[in-house]
């Protein structure tokens, strides 16, 4: 168990009048299953890219884990998933990868087929299996339910509930409710952390919005 510490994070795109983040500070445990919430265009993808070191920023992000993004780009789609795993982790243990696929209700035979021939749902399961056997990793999981039917979403939810250490971005609120135990939410140019799932966060937000509305009404009188 360790902490990911974000201190005074400030970032804005060149030419933009407003910063995406302004002195954002918070910490999260590397064992948490975090849902990342915010309206489209508010900075979710930007923050993931900052964790991945893709942009320069002011402030600090300190962590003892390696951030891994899903879905990661496969350089040669004609490679098999087994070859993809070997290129990333030359010394990985085959039984561990097979175990992950079984937990996702996926045929381990997928490992021997060209990646380009797999369905999008099969690709999702293969890539997640590879990432979750990497040592000392904290996953940044971006919309994993795309291309999955209801049954596969349920299987994936149960799978992720058994894991620790990730940030999950998903527009599927029921999926978030099932999986996460903490919420990261973007509030203007800051990020706040709360224990609970999406419903817990929404209830708290509704209370805060109602309180703010009442205060504004009092000021008008």
Segments predicted by a language model, with ranges:
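ABC ATP-binding cassette signature C-motif
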Residues: 1-216
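Short cytosolic helices in intracellular loops of multi-pass membrane proteins
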Residues: 218-221
């Amino acid at each position: 168990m360790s902490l990911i510490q974000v201190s005074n994070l400030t970032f804005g795109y060149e030419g933009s009048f407003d910063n995406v983040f302004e002195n954002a500070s918070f910490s999260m445990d590397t064992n948490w299953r975090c849902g990342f919430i915010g309206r489209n265009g508010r900075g979710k993808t930007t923050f993931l890219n900052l964790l991945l070191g893709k942009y320069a920023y002011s402030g600090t992000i300190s962590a003892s884990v390696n951030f891994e993004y899903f879905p990661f780009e496969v350089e040669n789609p004609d490679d098999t998933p087994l070859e993809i795993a070997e290129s990333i982790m030359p010394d990985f243990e085959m039984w561990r990868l097979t175990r992950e696929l079984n937990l996702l209700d996926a045929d381990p035979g997928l490992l021997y087929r060209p990646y380009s021939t797999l369905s999008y749902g099969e690709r999702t399961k293969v890539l997640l299996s590879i990432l979750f056997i990497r040592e000392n990793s904290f996953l940044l999981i971006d919309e994993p339910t795309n291309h999955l039917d209801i049954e596969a979403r349920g299987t994936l939810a149960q799978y992720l509930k058994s894991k620790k250490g990730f940030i999950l971005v998903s527009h599927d609120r029921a999926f978030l409710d099932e999986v996460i135990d903490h919420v990261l939410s973007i509030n203007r140019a800051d990020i706040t952390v709360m224990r609970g799932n999406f419903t817990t966060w929404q209830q708290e937000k509704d209370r805060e919005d109602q309180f703010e509305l009442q205060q504004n009404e009092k000021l008008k009188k």
